[in-house]
Amino acid sequence: GWKGHIDSPSWNALEIPGPAGPIHARMFSDHSRDDRPLIVYFHGGGWVIGDLDTHTPFCHLLHQRSGCNVISVDYRLAPEHPFPAAPDDCLAAAHWIAEHIGDFGGSDHRIILAGDSAGANLASVACLEADPALREKIAGEIIIYPVTDHYNAGFPSYVERAKGQTLTANFMFMFWDTYLGERRPGDPGAARAFPLRSQQLATLPPT
């Protein structure tokens, strides 16, 4: 395994105006270099768990290894705040950061949206829902093992890898059901939770 050393993470706290109050975020940057690309990162956790603390070591390492500044964005979690609270927060954060890009670096005044698992889902949703002004400022997306569709799509992996993994099929059922709350996949408005079903995939930035 890897035997390297990670320096203690250092970051600056941010508060971003959100649809239901402040959205908390952390910026990992090298203040001696303001011309680095800027990654906006959404943490994973099935839209139910995870926060800024759980992903601080990763975001710090991402900053160190990529040569990019990184803003890690928190968002409201289910069950207290079911869909669409999370994508609403993430889209609002992306808009605000893009509008204030001059305060955070950004080598070409553009951002890269990124995330893992549920966070990758939210990054893709934000890219798909970006208005023209925001879309011009998104240079790309980085999606790490993204959750792109509901379990009712019947993908073979839900059977082939149902057990024996840390993330079992039952966990995925729980995460999706908790996230959607009283909504069902076919309900009006629920489609935005499933980026793989979008008819606008060709509009996504380089991925």
Whereabouts are the PLM-identified features?
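Short loop/turn motifs at secondary-structure junctions and domain boundaries
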Residues: 5-8
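N-terminal targeting or regulatory segments adjacent to alpha/beta-hydrolase or S9 domains
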Residues: 1-3
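Alpha/beta-hydrolase superfamily serine-hydrolase fold, recognizing
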Residues: 10-207
